[in-house]
């Protein structure tokens, strides 16, 4: 029963969960802590579920040292729901209904496009020819009248990650941290809003955690749906509508696992070791493996690369994926919009998992070098 799974899951999200968490879920699935029912069938207004959601919130607060003047809420709709919720809640902070967006990849581009429905959106830098770097912040053209400045901390499709918090001159800073949430410590006080879908680093699909500063509540546009309104959800302790109870429970278990394994700082150390292992193989492959991202902006979470040359050799990449599958390594195919290969190294992916991939990459390189 306790034998580790032989399959290695490099999925970009939903992603691997810690094995011990899966065993805990399995153990409690039919009868949660002796109450006689599963969390799957538990009333969201019961005292048992109140303990679950309070525990999950407290762990978020503890692991990120969330200041007291921030609310932590659990919503549905994923990151895409927040692409709408952010402007609906915040674009009315200033009369001009405008916002600044930093667009460094597919997800921030999507967020900016969605926000255009609700106001004027200023992309703070010239459009990038390719998503392979973060434009130098000294070149950003921030609008002093913007209600907020938005960026995505880690772009899962293109493998671009911020290793700094942008200085936005006192403006309200909003961050999509879906794919590097709790992979490293973060100074929450520098942000107005942080949101993250759980299904990458902190749980299973279905719940999105939103951390919002108290003074930003109450400015939603009149047309904002109540389920997306931060003030309504915070005022109802995330119970305005039936929340994704099971996903919140799973998230609590994963947060407990992160805490027991040294917290965000320990996750950061592991992320550096794991990502460095793969980037070193890519960089020492004499151009056989190619990562298009500028070294200083490379993601520790998602490593996209091509095989054979910078544009990718389709036959080689197919062979790589087929062989990886034979070795029980799953979900290494790049996002459909960019192709190639992508290894996602979220918190639950172990150093041993990464070493298996590294050994395979070295062997594949040896087999195909001229």
Curated annotation (Swiss-Prot):
PTM annotation (N-acetylmethionine): residues: 1
Expressing tissues: Expressed at high levels in the brain, liver, kidney and pancreas, and very weakly expressed in the thymus, prostate, testis and colon.
GO biological process terms, semicolon-separated: L-serine biosynthetic process; pyridoxine biosynthetic process
Effect of substituting residue 70 to N: In NLS2; uncertain significance
GO molecular function, one term: identical protein binding
Phosphoserine found at: 331
Protein residues bound to pyridoxal 5'-phosphate: 79-80, 107, 156, 176, 199, 241-242
Activity control, per UniProt: Phosphoserine transaminase activity is strongly stimulated by increasing the ionic strength.
Pathway(s) per entry: Amino-acid biosynthesis; L-serine biosynthesis; L-serine from 3-phospho-D-glycerate: step 2/3
List of residues that carry N6-(pyridoxal phosphate)lysine: 200
Cofactor(s) annotated in UniProt: pyridoxal 5'-phosphate
SUPFAM superfamilies: PLP-dependent transferases
A GO CC term attached to the entry: extracellular exosome
Keyword Transferase: yes
Enzyme class, spelled out: transferase
Modified residues annotated as N6-acetyllysine in this record: 51, 127, 269, 318, 323, 333
Family: Belongs to the class-V pyridoxal-phosphate-dependent aminotransferase family. SerC subfamily.
Function summary: Involved in L-serine biosynthesis via the phosphorylated pathway, a three-step pathway converting the glycolytic intermediate 3-phospho-D-glycerate into L-serine. Catalyzes the second step, that is the pyridoxal 5'-phosphate-dependent transamination of 3-phosphohydroxypyruvate and L-glutamate to O-phosphoserine (OPS) and alpha-ketoglutarate.
Binding partners and assembly: Homodimer.
Clinical condition linked: Phosphoserine aminotransferase deficiency: Characterized biochemically by low plasma and cerebrospinal fluid concentrations of serine and glycine and clinically by intractable seizures, acquired microcephaly, hypertonia, and psychomotor retardation.
Protein name: Phosphoserine aminotransferase
